[in-house]
UniProtKB/Swiss-Prot annotation:
It comes from Mannheimia succiniciproducens (strain KCTC 0769BP / MBEL55E). The chain crosses the membrane at residues 26-46. It comes from the Bacteria. GO terms for molecular function: pentosyltransferase activity; peptidoglycan glycosyltransferase activity. This is Biosynthetic peptidoglycan transglycosylase. Its EC number is 2.4.99.28. The keyword Membrane applies. NCBIfam families: mono_pep_trsgly.
Length: 244
C-alpha cells in the first residue's frame, strides 16, 4: 500500500518567495529610513531614541503608567570636558582613531571569553550610539548584524564630535534617566557643564548597567571603577579631546 506524502499548503516555493520578498522590502525600507534619519540627525537634536521608546513601551505593557522618560538635549559645548573624557576613558579609549570598530579590542574580548565564564564586550561608542538610536537591546545575532552597517553609516555621515554628543545625550544613566544633562541634574543638582572630574567618572562608571550600578548609591565595585576611570582620564589628559 502506497502512503501519500503529506503536503502543507503554507510551505511551498511561492510562499517562500513571497516571504523573502517581504523581508527584502522591509529591509530596504529600514535601511532607507535609517539613512534618512542619520543624515537628518547630523544637524538637529534627537527627539527620542529607539531604546527610550522600547523602555516606555515595555513599562506600558507591564501596566506601569508612571514610568517617565527624563531627557534633556544639550549641545556638546554644554557638557563638561571631564564628562566627555570620562566616557572615552571608560568605554572606548581608541574612539578618536577607529572607524567604528576597535578590532584589537574585539580580538582581546574573544580571547578573554574563550577562557572565562564571564562575557566581556568590545562595543565602541559608535556601536553603542547606533544601538541606542535605532535598534533594540539584548543579545541577538540579528541585531548585531544590523548594527554593523548602521555603525558604518554613523561614522560616514557624522563627525566624531557628533557621535559623542549624541551618545552622551541618549545613554541611560538610571531608571528612565537618559542623557548626561538629566543625569547631572538628578544626581548632582547641577547642569552637565559644571560636572567635576569625580562626578563625571561616577556617571561613566554606571554606564555598563545603570539599573544595577547606581550613581546615587554606588557600590564598592562602582567606586573602584570610578577610581580606575579617574586614573585613565589623568593618563589621557583633556588634550585628548582635541583629536576628535
Amino acid at each position: 500500500m502506497r502512503l501519500k506524502t503529506l503536503k502543507f499548503p503554507f510551505v511551498n516555493k511561492k510562499n517562500t518567495r513571497t516571504f523573502k520578498k517581504k523581508c527584502g522590502r522591509f529591509l530596504s525600507y529600514f535601511i532607507g529610513l535609517t539613512v534618512a534619519l542619520t543624515f537628518l540627525f547630523r544637524f538637529v537634536p534627537i527627539p527620542f531614541s529607539a531604546y527610550m521608546a522600547e523602555q516606555k513601551l515595555a513599562h506600558i505593557i507591564q501596566l506601569d503608567f508612571d514610568y517617565k522618560v527624563n531627557y534633556d538635549w544639550i549641545s556638546l559645548e554644554d557638557i563638561s570636558p571631564y564628562m566627555q573624557l570620562a566616557v572615552i576613558a571608560a568605554e572606548d579609549q581608541n574612539f578618536p582613531n577607529h572607524g567604528g570598530f576597535d578590532w584589537n579590542a574585539i580580538k582581546s574580548a574573544i580571547k578573554y571569553n574563550e577562557k572565562s565564564s564571564r562575557i566581556r564586550g568590545a562595543s565602541t561608542i559608535s556601536q553603542q550610539t547606533a544601538k541606542n538610536m535605532f535598534l533594540w537591546h539584548g543579545q541577538s545575532w540579528i541585531r548585531k548584524g544590523i548594527e554593523v552597517p548602521v555603525t558604518f553609516m554613523l561614522e560616514t555621515l557624522w563627525s566624531k564630535k557628533r557621535i559623542l554628543e549624541v551618545y552622551l545625550n541618549i545613554a541611560e544613566f538610571g531608571n528612565g534617566i537618559f542623557g548626561v544633562e538629566a543625569a547631572s541634574r538628578y544626581y548632582f543638582k547641577k547642569p552637565a557643564k559644571r560636572l567635576t572630574q569625580s562626578e563625571a567618572a561616577l556617571l561613566a562608571a554606571v554606564l555598563p548597567n545603570p539599573i544595577i550600578y547606581k550613581a546615587n548609591r554606588p557600590s564598592l565595585l562602582v567606586r573602584k571603577k570610578q577610581a580606575w576611570i579617574i586614573r585613565q582620564m589623568n593618563s589621557l589628559g583633556l588634550n585628548y579631546l582635541k583629536k576628535l
